[in-house]
Amino acid sequence: MAHNHDHDHEHEVITLVDEQGNESLFEILLTIDGKEEFGKNYVLLVPAGSEEDEAGEIEIQAYSFTENEDGTEGDLQPIPEDSDAEWDMIEEVFNSFLDEE
């Protein structure tokens, strides 16, 4: 998923840790409430401080998460590539977000 990142506003920053223990900072671009339809929420992330490519686009990563019983956000999970309904919903919400930008 790519996003033309020509707007200028602050994003919340989170740290992701990969399987090797490497930490990477990401900016939260958008959160999506998918609890009613899929029983979980979604977050779209961009690498913190990343620059646009020659086409003016920046790489976006999407994850799902469920809230813990205490109301805190749980662990991020990759979205299955074969989950067309989830990806369609994410794309629809993201496109609406871009239209509002």
Swiss-Prot record:
Family annotation (NCBIfam families): PRK13678.1-2, PRK13678.1-4
InterPro entries tied to this protein: UPF0473 (IPR009711)
Protein's organism: Streptococcus uberis (strain ATCC BAA-854 / 0140J)
Family: Belongs to the UPF0473 family.
Name of one Pfam family that matches: DUF1292
Name this protein carries in UniProt: UPF0473 protein SUB1774
